[in-house]
Structures are given as C-alpha cells and as structure tokens.
C-alpha cells in the first residue's frame, strides 16, 4: 500500500482580553476560505492571501472594534502565523525560498520569503493616505510583522511603485500569497530532507 503523505494542517485558538480568534490552515489546499473578522477591508485582503497562496483558511476573529481595528488585525496575524508554523512542522522537504514581482494595474510590489525559522520583516512600502476607507493603512505592516514573527519566516516586501492605496495594499497581500505558495510546496528532489546545511529550520 502506498504511504499516505502527512497532513500539513495547523489550528490555533487564541483568546485575550482584547480578542478571541480561531484559525485553521491547510497548506495543501485549493485556496478556499471562510473569513470573519468584523473588518471588511481586512477580510477582503485575507481572502486574497488564501486564494493566491492556495492555502485553505478558516478564520473567525472577534475583537474590540469599538476601540479600533489594531488588536484584531495584529492578533489575527499572530494566529495565522502560528497556524502556518504548525502546518509546516519541521519544514522537511519544502522549497523554502520564493520571491515574486506582482503587478496590479499601475502598481508593482515584490515579496520574498525564506521559511527559515528565523522571523524577520523588511518593509519598504509607503502609503499616500492614512486610511483606505475606514481601514488604517499602517495596519498592513502590523499584520505582516505579526505573521512573520509567529510563522518563523523572513519576509521582505517592497512596493516598487503605485498610485492607488488599495492596489498597493492588495499587491502586498497577493505577492506574499504567491511567494508562500511556492515556498511551502514540497520539492520532490529534497526527498524529505530539511532544506538547510544545518539540518534544522526550527
């Protein structure tokens, strides 16, 4: 009988005085998502993250939105990062590295990832307005910082150019999604090895 591949899934439930969040991910999914954070623009961005990474995501977040969106966005990034790290396990056999330049109309953004186990964010993105609708643009960076720290990934995001702030934010999410899609894929040539001369990525 053929050996069954291990399931690459991860689930996290996180509750604080500010938020209550549950997240489940499947790295070998098809980009299906069920997302509810109470923040419409953020839900739209997370849908892009799931769709273009092909990572199935179930996200339910309830936060102190009567104060602002900050805690909900940051804590959702924490939970997604932790769930992805669980799904990666010891990171054996993964492609590990990926980068992409992603275009959307007038905007071009680059994302590069290393699933190194070493969390780091390089953020070179500037918005020309403090809000997209009612969403604070500074929260885009807060989300990716929380994601990188808790997934244990090195993440570089560089916006080359763009005029529309919605497009700039959306290309950040889509570019990271496409880079994660490649980096998390199993490379059959690795034959189950950890892709590091150190022998470990955790």
Swiss-Prot record:
Q: Which terms are listed as keywords in the entry?
A: Amino-acid biosynthesis, Cytoplasm, Histidine biosynthesis, Lyase
This protein's record includes keyword Signal: no
Q: What is its EC number?
A: 4.2.1.19
Major localisation: cytoplasm
The record's Gene3D superfamilies line, in alphabetical order, gives: Imidazole glycerol phosphate dehydratase, domain 1
Q: What class of enzyme is it?
A: lyase
- For this protein, what is any one GO molecular function term? imidazoleglycerol-phosphate dehydratase activity
Q: Does the keyword Phosphoprotein apply?
A: no
Q: In which pathway does it act?
A: Amino-acid biosynthesis; L-histidine biosynthesis; L-histidine from 5-phospho-alpha-D-ribose 1-diphosphate: step 6/9
Q: Which reaction does it catalyse?
A: D-erythro-1-(imidazol-4-yl)glycerol 3-phosphate = 3-(imidazol-4-yl)-2-oxopropyl phosphate + H2O
The compartments listed are: Cytoplasm
Q: Which GO terms describe its biological process?
A: L-histidine biosynthetic process
Q: Name one GO cellular component term.
A: cytoplasm
PROSITE patterns tied to this protein: IGP_DEHYDRATASE_1 (PS00954), IGP_DEHYDRATASE_2 (PS00955)
Recorded hits in InterPro entries, A to Z, give: IGPD_sf, ImidazoleglycerolP_deHydtase, ImidazoleglycerP_deHydtase_CS, Ribosomal_Su5_D2-typ_SF
Tell me any Pfam family this protein matches: IGPD
> Which HAMAP family does the entry mention?
HisB (MF_00076)
As for family, the record states: Belongs to the imidazoleglycerol-phosphate dehydratase family.
**Protein name as catalogued:** Imidazoleglycerol-phosphate dehydratase
């Amino acid at each position: 009988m053929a050996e069954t591949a291990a399931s690459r899934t991860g689930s996290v439930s996180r509750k604080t005085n500010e938020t209550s969040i549950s997240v489940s991910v499947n790295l070998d999914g098809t980009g299906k998502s069920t997302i509810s954070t109470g923040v419409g623009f953020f839900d739209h961005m997370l849908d892009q993250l799931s769709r273009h990474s092909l990572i199935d995501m179930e996200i339910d977040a309830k936060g102190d939105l009567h104060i602002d969106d900050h805690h909900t966005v940051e804590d959702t990034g924490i939970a997604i990062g932790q769930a992805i790290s669980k799904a990666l396990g010891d990171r054996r056999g993964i492609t590990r590295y990926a980068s992409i330049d992603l275009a959307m109309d007038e905007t071009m953004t680059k994302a590069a990832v290393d699933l190194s186990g070493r969390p780091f964010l390089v953020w070179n993105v500037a918005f020309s307005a403090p809000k997209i609708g009612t969403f604070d643009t500074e929260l885009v960076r807060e989300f990716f910082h929380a994601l990188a720290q808790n997934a244990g990934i090195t993440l570089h995001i560089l916006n080359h150019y763009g005029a529309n702030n919605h497009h700039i934010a959306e290309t950040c999410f889509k570019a990271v999604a496409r880079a994660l899609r490649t980096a998390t894929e199993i490379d059959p040539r690795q034959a189950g090895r950890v892709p590091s001369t150190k022998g470990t990525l955790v």
